């Protein structure tokens, strides 16, 4: 029985300048690895057996009502502008209206070459597909806006990277796939009518109360400020914050070489291609602001009097650091038991982070221990911790039920790098048990009792670098 879904493909109704229509490249022998039943139910996707799901979510068969296309965009990559990028290995099947009334994109990643593939094969291998599946679902469970994983399928075909690897396809669900780079390409080309139509579309879809291009900018800046504060509160490092990986929806998108830090250090970098540390953990707020400045530059091109609008756009972007700081303070305050932190609490939070850096304490486990037991064992210099702890307990004396506040803000488990690599290595050999175990724990991160997955890596297990690896 053919899979059905409530498709309503608004992007496909825009002019062809925004995309190229094409179908996924069929694969030889698809098989289903995982399917996200609760998400599928929200999307209104009909029931089907594993074989039918494998066929549809590998791109071998189109669901009824799909309008497949590859989207066009540009982007700054590590600060350098690339005037044309686009979906080089992804195809948007279409949009569905979920049972919650929201509009969602359904996209296949690894679905074959497109006109934007730039000599690539358009495919993905199993490792990055499973990484994004687990990490994006973990982020959702952690309360951070994110694209989500609907399905993972094997293609039955190999892909050639440094070696021969099993091919796979990820079905990704997003509020949309509009990026900063989507606006940049039409501003760069001076296609002002297209830029205006794209802006109107984005406002209608993501910021219906926004007043024109600058209203959209204000809404996106606010969403991105909340997003990056969420990352910082979890020790998450995106790794490739290019403008083509910056979503207008304010969702985390394109996980690539992402990672969660183990030992806390503000300068942590994992991405093998980030040689200068541009996207280091501590730089993420600054880069988010920089990306929004690029969005402002693109949006201004359509204004009747762009010079007059520059001042307002500048004020909007310059307000972002304060927005990020406020969102960060709120999240970090809760992690130490303060339900409504004020700027006066910043030294207390920063004092703990400084101590964690000096003592090489584990980021996730330190906050978990504060919430549920005694964090003293996380530190080598316990006298220094005791000094901080005295100030902390004095502050908590005014709080109601701080343990509950902390436990709701501090996960017990994250998808640690060494566990992700372990999961991928096993899956390549046909063993999906580690994937299923990690996924189960990370989708209930505040309640898991899997102490083994909570454990930081040993010296031999540390993963020093991550790779896009697509």
UniProtKB/Swiss-Prot annotation:
Cofactor(s) named in the record: Mg(2+); Mn(2+)
Molecular functions (GO terms): AMPylase activity; ATP binding; magnesium ion binding
Iron is among the record's keywords: no
Keyword field: ATP-binding, Magnesium, Manganese, Metal-binding, Nucleotide-binding, Nucleotidyltransferase, Transferase
Annotated binding of ATP, by residue: 86, 88-89, 109, 121-122, 172, 179, 254
Its EC number(s): 2.7.7.-, 2.7.7.108
Catalytic activity: L-seryl-[protein] + ATP = 3-O-(5'-adenylyl)-L-seryl-[protein] + diphosphate; L-threonyl-[protein] + ATP = 3-O-(5'-adenylyl)-L-threonyl-[protein] + diphosphate; L-tyrosyl-[protein] + ATP = O-(5'-adenylyl)-L-tyrosyl-[protein] + diphosphate; L-histidyl-[protein] + UTP = N(tele)-(5'-uridylyl)-L-histidyl-[protein] + diphosphate
Binding site for Mg(2+): 245, 254
InterPro entries assigned: SelO
Keyword Magnesium: yes
Catalytic residue list: 244 (proton acceptor)
Superkingdom per UniProt: Bacteria
Function: Nucleotidyltransferase involved in the post-translational modification of proteins. It can catalyze the addition of adenosine monophosphate (AMP) or uridine monophosphate (UMP) to a protein, resulting in modifications known as AMPylation and UMPylation.
Similarity remark: Belongs to the SELO family.
Protein's UniProt name: Protein nucleotidyltransferase YdiU
Gene: ydiU
């Amino acid at each position: 029985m053919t899979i059905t879904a409530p498709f309503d493909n608004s992007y496909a109704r825009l002019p062809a300048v925004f995309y190229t229509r094409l179908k996924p490249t069929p694969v030889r022998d698809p098989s289903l690895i995982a399917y996200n039943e609760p998400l599928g139910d929200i999307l209104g996707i009909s029931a089907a057996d594993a074989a039918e799901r494998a066929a549809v979510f590998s791109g071998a068969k189109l669901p009824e009502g799909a309008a497949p296309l590859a989207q066009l965009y540009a982007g700054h990559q590590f600060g350098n502008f690339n005037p044309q990028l686009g979906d080089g290995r992804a195809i948007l099947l279409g949009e569905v209206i979920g049972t919650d009334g929201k509009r969602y994109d359904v996209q296949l990643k690894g679905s074959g070459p497109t006109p934007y593939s730039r000599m690539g094969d358009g495919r993905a291998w199993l490792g990055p597909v499973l990484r994004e599946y687990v990490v994006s679902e973990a982020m959702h469970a952690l309360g951070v806006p994110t694209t989500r994983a609907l399905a993972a399928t094997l293609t039955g075909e190999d892909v050639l990277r440094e070696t021969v690897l099993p091919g796979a396809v990820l079905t990704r669900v997003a509020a949309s796939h509009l990026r900063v780079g989507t606006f940049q390409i039409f501003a760069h080309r001076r296609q002002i009518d297209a830029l205006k139509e794209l802006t109107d579309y984005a406002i209608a879809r993501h910021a219906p109360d926004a007043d024109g291009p600058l209203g959209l900018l204000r809404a996106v800046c606010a969403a991105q400020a909340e997003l990056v504060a969420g990352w910082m509160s979890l020790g998450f490092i995106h790794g490739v914050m290019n403008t083509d990986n910056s979503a207008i929806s304010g969702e985390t998108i394109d996980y690539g070489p992402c990672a969660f830090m183990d030992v806390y250090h503000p300068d942590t970098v994992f991405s093998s291609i980030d040689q200068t540390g541009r996207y280091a953990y501590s730089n993420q707020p600054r880069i988010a602001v920089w990306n929004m400045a690029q969005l402002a530059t693109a949006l201004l091109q359509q204004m009747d009097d762009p010079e007059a609008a520059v001042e307002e756009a500048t004020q909007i972007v310059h307000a972002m650091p304060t927005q990020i700081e406020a969102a960060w303070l709120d999240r970090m305050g809760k992690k130490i038991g303060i339900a409504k932190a004020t700027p006066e609490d910043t030294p207390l939070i920063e004092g703990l982070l400084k101590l964690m850096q000096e003592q090489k304490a584990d980021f996730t486990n330190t906050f978990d221990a504060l919430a549920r037991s005694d964090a003293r064992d996380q530190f080598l210099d316990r006298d220094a911790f005791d000094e901080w702890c005295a100030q902390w307990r004095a502050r908590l004396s005014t709080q109601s039920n701080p343990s509950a506040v902390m436990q709701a803000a501090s996960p017990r488990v994250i998808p640690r790098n060494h566990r992700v690599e372990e999961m991928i290595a096993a899956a390549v050999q046909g063993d999906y048990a580690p994937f299923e175990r990690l996924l189960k724990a990370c989708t209930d991160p505040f309640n898991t009792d899997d102490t083994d997955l909570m454990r930081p890596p040993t010296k031999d297990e540390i993963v020093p670098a991550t790779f896009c690896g697509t």
